[in-house]
Regions:
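Juxtamembrane intracellular "pre-TM" segments in multi-pass secondary transporters
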Residues: 7-30, 211-248
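Helix-loop boundary and gating motifs at the non-cytosolic
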Residues: 27-78, 247-248, 252, 256-274
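Residue-level signature of mid-helix packing/kink "hotspots" within the transmembrane helices
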Residues: 78-86, 171, 289-297
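Helix-to-loop junctions at the C-terminal end of transmembrane segments
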Residues: 84-96, 181, 295-307
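C-terminal ends and interior cores of transmembrane alpha-helices
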Residues: 106-119
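Cytoplasmic helix-loop-helix junction between adjacent transmembrane helices
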Residues: 127-167
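Symmetry-related core transmembrane helices of the 12-TM Major Facilitator Superfamily/SLC fold
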Residues: 189-206
Length: 316
């Protein structure tokens, strides 16, 4: 396999707002890339906190029996995360990537505390609104920043490593909360790790992660991308309707996340109703994101060689 360093793009011309020439490529930016992988692992761990326990908290602590009400936390999370994803890209180009990443972590800080202290189900729903902001801003921003760093040649690998870190962390966090819940109850013990995840994610993002918008500008200059850019509405129409390939990719993502939501919201309740212990529920809920994450290492790298279309079709 060709070493990462041999795949680096040429040094870009210095930009007015950067102190030194910018290099694109995984080898040239390995330290920052690794930090972003770690940050996204914390992002995944935050959402993994809820995979095993929160649907059960609805019934055990608040006496909710309606599946519609139980799933309201997931609906609030999904809507807010979708909106955060929608605007994250445009805002990242306007104000920079790092400010969005930090803002996402600030939104995530109260989440475990709200769940721990919640006197009513409404607190859980509000915690998931904040978690949706956290996930939408932080996950999207880490994706954008990794793509900025590696340049055009290895974007599949960059995405694969991002998703690997995120979903393996989801899995391990779900497994951990299952064991903590079995040993110490549904609250508060399973959510204590979330405080550490949020604080560490914020600290690394503030003090170690660097802005990558200059890398995107450098790549644009190298490629001579002087054509006028589409506005927000034009990009939205292109990706969601006008371009058939992008439309197909968008609907595939929709279906994929609908499946994920079903697994997250219903499987813990289904298993608990049949007498499955909390630690075993944790194993089941951890298996799905673990396989998802491990597969990303292969599919991300292979998509750079073989293309994306048939991998998406095979997965569907």
């Amino acid at each position: 396999m060709t070493p990462w360093s041999s795949r680096q793009a040429p040094i870009a011309a210095p930009l007015p707002d950067t102190p030194s020439p910018i290099r694109l490529g995984l080898g040239a930016n390995s330290r920052q890339f690794t930090l972003l992988v770690v940050v996204n692992a914390f992002v995944g761990a935050m959402v993994g906190l809820e995979r095993t326990v929160v649907p059960l908290v609805a019934q055990a602590d608040f006496g909710l029996v309606s599946k519609t009400i139980v799933l309201s936390f997931l609906v609030s999370f999904g809507i807010v995360k979708a909106l955060a994803n929608l605007f994250a890209g445009q805002l990242a180009d306007r104000i920079g990537r790092k400010p969005l990443l930090v803002a996402g972590w600030l939104a995530g800080l109260p989440v475990p505390l709200l769940i721990i202290w919640a006197p009513s189900w409404g607190w859980i729903v509000f915690a998931n609104v904040l978690l949706g902001v956290n996930q939408g801003l932080c996950w999207s921003t880490t994706v954008i920043m990794k793509i900025d760093l590696v340049g055009p040649a290895r974007r599949g690998l960059a995405m694969g490593m991002n998703e690997f870190a995120g979903y393996v962390a989801v899995s391990l966090s779900a497994l951990l909360t299952g064991y903590l819940a079995a040993a110490h109850g549904l609250r508060p013990a399973p959510f204590y790790p979330g405080i550490a995840f949020a604080v560490l994610g914020l600290v690394v993002s503030v003090f170690a992660v660097r802005e990558t918008r200059g890398h995107a500008r450098a790549e644009s200059r190298q490629l001579g991308a002087d054509a006028p850019r589409l506005g927000f509405g034009g990009v939205f129409l292109l990706t969601s309707w006008r371009d058939r390939a992008l439309f197909a990719a968008s609907q595939a993502g929709l279906v994929n996340n609908l499946n994920d939501g079903m697994v997250w919201g219903l499987i813990p309740v289904f298993l608990a109703a049949r007498g499955v212990t909390l630690d075993r529920i944790g194993v089941v809920t951890a298996t799905y994101p673990l396989v998802w994450g491990m597969g990303q290492l292969a599919t991300g790298a292979l998509s750079d060689r073989w293309g994306r279309k048939w991998m998406i079709a095979s997965g569907m």
